[in-house]
Design a protein with these regions (language model features):
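Conserved active-site regions of diverse hydrolases
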Residues: 2-409
Length: 409
């Protein structure tokens, strides 16, 4: 058995074991952890931290949808950063259906969102003036104002996330969108469907799992299977070629306003820092270097898509620079801990044990944390990021922020 197979089996056993333990015990149990770690030895920020008050000013209120919406519908593609419940309907260990997930969500209940509360699509929908798009697997005919296809553990490649069980890779999400388009045609006719899709927002936040649960699956000392097959540059090209292919498929089905989110600081994730034995105050720079290269190449691909399709509008949304700024200057944004998860166990709370009774600790105030668990952000940082996407300017949004994109003819 190869070493990469051993690592895959270890991860599989760990996650399946967690699910068995979770099913055998109460999901209501919680604990508190007051451990706070300060960040240090990091670069001077690129962002002006003084805008945090403005970014937090907009409240989330799904009832405030009487105003005219900026887009008629929102279609979301991605992974657990955007999954609002699709994985609830799949056989997978990648589920967020037990407390403390959702403890700060309206009603204080888990919904399948990998967060303490609301996530990106919720905040985005509020800005747009629409309800949060329903998860495709339980949407039924509720599709006129958009659908969320995002699935936890999924990636651009079909193989990414297989260690967790069933998921909807990007290719499957696009296939499901074709089903939605067909249903829309039955409701609105071809002309009505074309008009709706041409004005709707197509939002992509995908690619993290292709690295975290695939390319960077091992501890860095032994290469993963994909690392033996592809150099970082070759793997980057593989991902982007597949991503562009899916975007082209959506364009052919009528998508005309598309926003693509770059990767965040994957080298700062508690799980990666635990696996690679990172220091208490710094991130794994070798991973972040690869992420920065990917983001630059992604922006170039978006420029190429725009040149190839002048009747559509594409924009790039940068999350890396803002999160990096928060990590380097946490107090300016109201954070106290930016390198460990609020919920979990192990060093940096980098183990995926949040919601497993008896195996996790959880902080008292998630708003002081950047990370909620081993890889996912807290609701607070999601709100800040979406505010940047909505009102930000270069280099947070290139060439348009999401509000400007809506107003482009």
């Amino acid at each position: 058995m190869g070493i990469h197979e051993i690592y895959i089996r270890i991860w599989t056993v760990a996650f399946v074991g967690c699910m068995v333990l979770a099913d055998a015990a109460s999901a209501e149990e919680s604990a508190r952890d007051g451990v706070i770690r300060k960040s240090g030895n990091l670069r001077v920020p690129d962002h002006d931290a003084g805008d945090v008050a403005f970014l937090m000013r907009q409240p989330w209120n799904q009832k405030n949808n009487h105003r005219k919406s900026y887009y008629p519908a929102i279609f979301i593609f991605g992974d657990s950063l955007s999954d609002v419940g699709n994985n609830n309907n799949l056989i997978t260990t990648a589920k967020a259906t037990r407390l403390p997930y959702g403890r700060d969500f309206p009603g204080a209940k888990p919904t399948g969102r990998f967060s303490n509360g609301l996530i990106g699509p919720d905040f985005l929908a509020e800005y747009v003036g629409l309800p949060t798009p329903p998860p495709y697997l339980s949407a039924g005919n509720n599709i006129l104002q958009g659908v969320c296809f995002a699935s936890a553990s999924s990636g651009i490649l079909n193989s990414s996330g297989n260690v967790f069980g069933e998921h909807l890779p990007l290719a499957k999400q696009v296939t499901y969108f074709a089903n939605v388009r067909q249903a829309l045609q039955a409701m609105l006719g071809e002309k009505g469907t074309k008009n709706l899709l041409g004005k709707s927002l197509f939002y992509f936040n995908v690619g993290s799992n292709d690295y975290v649960t695939n390319y960077f699956l091992t501890n860095g000392q032994v290469p993963s299977l994909l690392q033996t097959q592809y150099t970082p540059s070759q793997f980057e090209d593989l991902l982007l070629s597949n991503l562009v292919l899916r975007i082209e498929e959506l364009y052919a089905m009528g998508a005309r306003k598309m926003a693509v989110v770059g990767l965040s600081v994957l080298g700062c994730l508690p799980a990666q820092r635990l696996i690679r034995k990172g220091s208490p105050t710094t991130c794994v720079e070798s991973i972040n270097e690869i992420v920065r290269s990917y983001n630059i190449a992604l922006l170039n691909r978006i420029h190429s898509l725009q040149a190839a399709h002048p009747d559509a509008v594409f924009t790039y949304l940068d999350t890396y620079r803002f999160i990096d700024s928060v990590i380097r200057q946490p107090s300016a944004y109201g954070f106290e801990n930016v390198l460990a998860g609020c919920c979990g166990s192990g060093r940096f709370h980098g183990l995926p044990t949040c919601s497993i009774p008896g195996l996790y600790k959880v902080c008292e105030d998630a708003s002081k944390y950047l990370f909620w668990d081993f890889v996912h952000p807290t609701s607070k940082i999601d709100k800040l990021v979406i505010a940047k996407f909505w009102t930000g300017s270069y280099p947070d949004a290139i060439p348009y922020n999401l509000r400007e994109l809506a107003l482009v003819p």
